[in-house]
């Protein structure tokens, strides 16, 4: 497509030059024709310029069209929401089997956006006191790294990418699901608006590329039109095409920021679901970098 566009560009340019040369050689124009020369030449230039703009759009389409204002609004709001995070939270993470059996874990988490990006630190404690701690860091450009202290381990280590999609404490949430990196991917598309339940929603499709460290090929988010907060998210895994659904309940505004009190995760083809319930915390925790020492966090067992 690029080579074809360049060929057309060259063809249009040469055609334009031929028009100018032919007109300049016609010395036997009458006064009437001479008086029309300016208009004719100007019209030729206009047509050629218009054609060149069209052809350049084939080579650089993103320069030919203004940015979608709704897309810009949705992306800006989503990124700013994440860039303003500064919270502590406590609650429980529950796996509900297809037969109704429940297994609950204590959940403690905190997050803060710093000058170098977002840090999320959380700990999940099971019924037998086994603990999983993880520290997720996302840079300002969206690059993600994960450290973890898994059950039976005494020290934190970098979690290999191959394990990012592992179930977190046996639930439908994965390690990667603890962060919303999709809003920082380069490939973003705003689909036709839809209703989700009673809510009018923007529908944003975020697609990953080879530079994005993620197990997801795409993430589609339904964001409430009025508050620009996700109410439904559908993640599609690379390779398999398997989908994971996230539903947000109990939306509330605390200190000017919107959040959900519950998030339910359902994996396609797997009975049951998992529910993260936030029971307490602070939306303006004034956290510092020292609050994200995963070794100290695991040793404390509670958040200060």
Regions picked out by a protein language model, each given a short descriptive name:
Residues 25-49:
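Bacterial N-terminal signal peptides that target proteins for export
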Residues 67-76, 80-86, 101, 130, ...:
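Flexible, processing/modification-adjacent segments and terminal tails
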Residues 83-96, 120:
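A short, Trp-centered hydrophobic/proline-enriched beta-strand micro-motif
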Residues 125, 145, 157, 166, ...:
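Gly/Pro-enriched, hydrophobic low-complexity segments
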